[in-house]
Amino acid sequence: MEIKKGTWIIKKGFAEMFKGGVIMDVTSAEQAKIAEEAGAVAVMALERVPADIRKEGGVARMASIAKIREIMEAVSIPVMAKVRIGHIAEAKILEELGVDFIDESEVLTPADDRFHINKHEFKVPFVCGARDLGEALRRIAEGAAMIRTKGEAGTGNVVEAVKHMRRMMEQIKQVTKMEDEELVAYGKEIGAPVELLREVKRLGRLPVVNFAAGGVATPADAALMMMLGADGVFVGSGIFKSKDPRKMAKAMVLAVTYWDNPRILLKISEDIGEPMRGLDVEELEVRMQERGW
């Protein structure tokens, strides 16, 4: 147990290195190089960005090994890759391949409708999505070393990411004011281990890095998520579905760095070209955020 705990501490320490940065979805070596040159702290290797997964439908699986290896060989920054929720075999394959981080992601079609992966059994660290404190702490209990909002990926609409971040921050604030017996009852209510709730109370935040993700499409969106308390930002379709990906990628990185400086944000937001076209979340047939439990 102590070995696993120590490993988790190392894993979450690795995730701390991403704080204040942008992690970008890429589908080719060329895109990965653009992301690295723009200042991304890591890239997420994918076969299709979330907007295309949403548009094309079908079963979305782990990217091909050839695709991931191509991206790993193209850049010197960490490379992440997604696996389906509960798909232990995909995760073992990616660990053997040598990716730096695995995202057990609701963007892909879930493989198990009852269980998430036991992430303690892996040496490679995992990031998982969450809509609230209960989901976040369940994933951390399973061994996640990093959390991100689920938002609504592939929409270019930040409203759901905002909702999830605000909800989580409000719940954390409530926890900091609770007595221990209240923590026990609250843990039962939200399905979270009381030991982790005690840690949240002590820290006044999640015990792991908490990024924003899902619908971030403009530098202003990225800055907004930082204002709401995010430690950094994942950008999926927002960069390479924009009119000028190079400019947009650089602008996203600068917006996360200077999120609290309106003068710089104004300058960043000028001459970046058209952002990706957004979708109204209320009109969606498939809500990826509802995948997972």
From Swiss-Prot:
Reactions catalysed, as given in the entry: aldehydo-D-ribose 5-phosphate + D-glyceraldehyde 3-phosphate + L-glutamine = pyridoxal 5'-phosphate + L-glutamate + phosphate + 3 H2O + H(+)
Keyword Lyase assigned: yes
EC numbers, comma separated: 4.3.3.6
Residues given in the record as D-ribose 5-phosphate binding sites: D25, G154, G215, G236, S237
Pathway, per record: Cofactor biosynthesis; pyridoxal 5'-phosphate biosynthesis
Short name of any one Pfam family annotated for the protein: SOR_SNZ
PROSITE patterns, alphabetized: PDXS_SNZ_1, PDXS_SNZ_2
Assembly and interaction partners: In the presence of PdxT, forms a dodecamer of heterodimers.
Assigned protein family: Belongs to the PdxS/SNZ family.
PANTHER family hit by this protein: PYRIDOXAL 5'-PHOSPHATE SYNTHASE SUBUNIT SNZ1-RELATED
The protein's name in its UniProt record: Pyridoxal 5'-phosphate synthase subunit PdxS
UniProt organism field: Thermotoga petrophila (strain ATCC BAA-488 / DSM 13995 / JCM 10881 / RKU-1)
Gene: pdxS
